[in-house]
Structures are given as structure tokens and as C-alpha cells.
Amino acid sequence: MAKGQSLQDPFLNALRRERVPVSIYLVNGIKLQGQIESFDQFVILLKNTVSQMVYKHAISTVVPSRPVSHHSNNAGGGTSSNYHHGSSAQNTSAQQDSEETE
């Protein structure tokens, strides 16, 4: 659980801090838009004309309207090296898998 939080907390925090508009897609296909006002382990408070409490288990995807710097600055370090973007992360993973099987 802590591993998942180490990825999502800095990302959501950057979106909240920088007041980046986001689109949140729910698992049922509904698209919500607004700014992340707050969040905890289970919910995200999304503000638009009103504030909505959105349960994380209902969220499929969070899409920022612009790129954000979401690397962790905590004393534990190392977290930022775990971030991967786009196909390069998939290629790296596939390459590691093929090296392990040889």
C-alpha cells in the first residue's frame, strides 16, 4: 500500500498545489472536470462550480490539462526515480523481462 501512495500522493499534491485543471474519468465512463482541492487515502475533493467528493475506487484515470512536475522532495529520496512516462517505461520493462528470461 505504501508503494502505491508513494506514486499517487506526490502527483495529486502537485496538481493540488499548482491548481492544475484536471479531467477525472470514472470507471463507468463519466468525465469530471475541475481542480483538486484536497485528497486522502480514499477520496479526492474536486472543485468546479461545486465541490464533489470522488471515491478513488471509482476513478479510472486522472488527466492533467498540462504537464506537472510531480517528483517527490521527501527525505526518503529515491521516489522520483520510480516515475516512468510513455513508451520508454514500457520498453525498459520489456527489455528487463527479456534479459531475465535469458
Curated annotation (Swiss-Prot):
Pfam families from the UniProt entry: Hfq
Keywords, sorted A to Z: Cytoplasm, DNA-binding, RNA-binding, Stress response
Self-association state and partner proteins as the record states: Homohexamer. Interacts with H-NS.
GO cellular component: bacterial nucleoid; cytosol
Family assignment from sequence similarity: Belongs to the Hfq family.
GO biological process terms, semicolon-separated: positive regulation of translation, ncRNA-mediated; regulation of DNA-templated transcription; regulation of RNA stability; regulation of translation, ncRNA-mediated; sRNA-mediated post-transcriptional gene silencing; tRNA processing
Gene3D superfamilies, A to Z: 2.30.30.100
Ranges for region Disordered: 63-102
Main location: cytoplasm
NCBIfam families according to UniProt: Hfq, PRK00395.1
Regulation: Forms condensates in vivo, both in the absence and presence of stress, which differ in their material state. Hfq condensation has no impact on transcription but seems important for the roles of Hfq as an mRNA chaperone at the post-transcriptional level. Hfq condensation also appears important for its role as an sRNA stabilizer.
Record localization: Cytoplasm
Protein name per UniProt: RNA-binding protein Hfq
Domain Sm: 9-68
Null mutant phenotype: Deletion of hfq seems to lead to a significant translational fidelity problem. Deletion increases persister cell formation. Deletion abolishes the antitoxin activity of sRNA antitoxin RalA, preventing it from neutralizing toxin RalR.
Ranges annotated as biased composition (Polar residues): 70-96
Effect of substituting residue 19 to A: Almost completely disrupts the ability of Hfq to form condensates in both growing and late stationary phases
Main function: RNA chaperone that binds small regulatory RNA (sRNAs) and mRNAs to facilitate mRNA translational regulation in response to envelope stress, environmental stress and changes in metabolite concentrations. Involved in the regulation of stress responses mediated by the sigma factors RpoS, sigma-E and sigma-32. Binds with high specificity to tRNAs. Binds sRNA antitoxin RalA. In vitro, stimulates synthesis of long tails by poly(A) polymerase I. Required for RNA phage Qbeta replication.
UniProt GO molecular function: ATP binding; bent DNA binding; DNA binding; RNA binding; RNA folding chaperone; tRNA binding
